Amino acid sequence: MQSLTIPRPDDWHLHLRDGAMLQTTVPATAAVFHRAVVMPNLVPPVTTVAAAMEYRERILAEIPAGMSFNPLMALYLTADTTPAEIAEAAANEHVIGFKLYPSGATTNSAAGVKSVEALAPVLAAMQEHQVPLLVHGEVTDSDIDIFDRERVFIERHLIPITERFPQLKLVLEHITTADAVKFVENANSNVAATMTPQHLLMNRNDLLVGGIRPHNYCLPILKRRSHQQALQQAALSGNPKFFLGTDSAPHVQANKETACGCAGCYSAPAAIELYAEFFSQHNALDKLANFASVFGADFYQLPRNTETIELVQQPWTVAETVDTATGPMVPYWAGSDLQWKLRG
């Protein structure tokens, strides 16, 4: 049986939700990943260091005995965020950065920013204190096609931000387009990007052909195949600017299979195996370790993990559903096979 040992990976973009859902989401991620950047789009959003530390305690309470897991908290950037709050966040080792959500771009983003330009004083403070800006890169104008939202955001906002604040550490999250790949490649070393399993393994045909497939629906939405290929090439290139961020986003089945279904793929139960599937498909399993375990830690200037995990080539089928305290959840890739499995 073939096997692959890599340093324990980190998930640089994760949604755990709150309350009883943590009983399901925290163990699923802690079983594999040493660290995860936890997104702040709760209701109400996590906008202060104090709120983030309270949320972190709720997460820590759900880590199973014998597991080590370090949640790194992202704060929700709003029009009311102050430079003083940036300084407070910079002094807290458990805060990784601030998340920029354009208002209305994704789940629970109503409190998001309506004017990126108005953030200049806060971005200056983030640059000064070297606090990373984590970006959901989509405009939300009603006249912009949903498949163009990322490209327009880059042109309208990200290029000006990086030109004005060249020392600001910036992560363009869950990239989906060739435009995003080009932007990150052309930017300086302070700019990086996370990539999800679904955007590497699928394109919009997998969402829309043969019926609407709600469990493949996420935001930013899956794009055409040429964009998928650009993402794949970037992940396979070994460029350290591109690294793992699942954007695993749990929603109960009833909220996905409905007339107005929620956006998000719950990939945590098979996360590292999904990435292994992608790299294996491209005969590039040797690239998995850096993508999953090295590049993100290096970008955030955090120590690389010394523990290891082992994957074995052993076909298995992802469960059709995952039980939670608030109802069944359909994981990403449900009922489909993967070729690699985490040992243990």
Curated annotation (Swiss-Prot):
PROSITE patterns assigned to the protein according to its UniProt record, in alphabetical order: DIHYDROOROTASE_1 (PS00482), DIHYDROOROTASE_2 (PS00483)
Disulphide bond pairs: none
PTM-bearing positions, type N6-carboxylysine: K99
Function of the molecule: Catalyzes the reversible cyclization of carbamoyl aspartate to dihydroorotate.
Record lineage: Bacteria, Pseudomonadati, Pseudomonadota, Gammaproteobacteria, Alteromonadales
Catalytic residues as annotated in Swiss-Prot or TrEMBL: D247
Co-factor binding comment: Binds 2 Zn(2+) ions per subunit.
Listed name of the protein: Dihydroorotase
Organism, as annotated: Idiomarina loihiensis (strain ATCC BAA-735 / DSM 15497 / L2-TR)
